[in-house]
Structure formats: structure tokens, C-alpha cells
Amino acid sequence: RLDGVTGVQTCALPILQASIINAGDGCHAHPTQALLDIFTMKERKGRVQGLKVAIIGDILHSRVARSNIWGLTKLGADVTLCGPTTLIPVGIRNLGVKVTHDLNDVLGTSDVLMLLRLQKERQQDKFLPSIREYARVFGINKEKLKKAKKDVLIMHPGPTNRGVELTADVADGEYSVILEQVTNGVAVRMAVMYLMSGKKTAE
């Protein structure tokens, strides 16, 4: 795991005689998080292909968003990114996703609402006018959830900022699968380590 550093594992591959598991490198990728997220969707919805997934928040700095975009589009999901203009990367549509800056565009149509953690540094770095304004426009609360599908899944890679990305009653509510993501993460990462140890099939 390399916070703030991108691509070290790629440089290391030619000189190491070992498998490398990327547990998160800078803003680039977080493959095991995407695997557990997709596993959770499949477990709950029975499929990934055709699901409408909205990824909401700081896409620009999110390795979780990038890995989920790659995985979900590969498996046939319909992915829409939603967030402030300043936090959506230029050219991101080239990855086969839609982009909107209006939460209402995704609230009523999405099967999954995946919220991303917003770091306080984004306000300090002038990406946002204020955290409070972000929460007002892009945060999910019970009132906004009334517009969502009755079987929508609320996901978050953690740690959450309660009162920013989502309110406490949403995080702990009936639509939230955040704790399931954590539980599934143990099994998924165990499976990755098992396969990387040289085992190709489950015994």
C-alpha cells in the first residue's frame, strides 16, 4: 500500500520474483477494494451486468473510483460519475462512463449509490467552497433517499465522514451495505492471497 505514490508496483515487477498485490497506490488504483465492492453488488443484486451504478464525490483523487470504473465497465455495468466540476477528471468519459454534476440525475435511477470519502484538504486546496456546501449538494440524507429506488444499495469504501458524504441514519440504515463491504473484504482479500500464492483453483 503506497499512499501518495503511484506505479511503484509496476516498476518492481521486472526485478522481483514474487507476486505483487496492489493494496492501493496513490490516486491510481485500489483493485482489492473494487473486487470486494463488485462482489457485494453481485451478492446483493445477483448480477453486475446492466446495473446502474453512480459513483459520487471526489473522483479526481480517488483510486477506489478508478478501480471500480475499470471493473464495473468491464463487467457490463452502466456507470455514472457525479460530483463537483473541480473533482471530476478531464477526459474521464473516455473510460466509458457518464458524467453529471447534478445529484438528482442519478438519485432516482441508480441501483447502487457509491459514495467516496471527501478529505478536508480539498477545501484547503480550493477544490470546494466549503465542506458544508458539498454536504448540502452531494451528501445523501433520508430526505434525498426518498427519491431513490426502493432497493437501492448505499456503499462507501470507508472511512466515512458522517454528515458530509452521508448522514448517520443513512450509513446505519436499511439501504446501507457498508458493513457488508467490510466483511466481504476479508474473504475477497483472502482469496486474492490464496490465488497469488500459486493456487489456481479452490480445493
State where each predicted segment sits:
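Single conserved hydrophobic/aromatic residue that forms the stacking wall/gate
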Residues: 1-11
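Short, structured coil segments at secondary-structure junctions
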Residues: 9, 15-17, 75, 93-95, ...
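General beta-strand structural signal in soluble alpha/beta enzymes
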Residues: 19-23, 30, 55, 81, ...
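A glycine-rich, Thr/Ser-enriched phosphate-binding loop motif common to dinucleotide/cofactor-binding enzymes
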Residues: 25-40
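Glycine-rich phosphate/diphosphate-binding loop of Rossmann-like nucleotide-binding domains
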Residues: 38, 43-116
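Rossmann-like adenosine-cofactor binding region
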Residues: 92-169
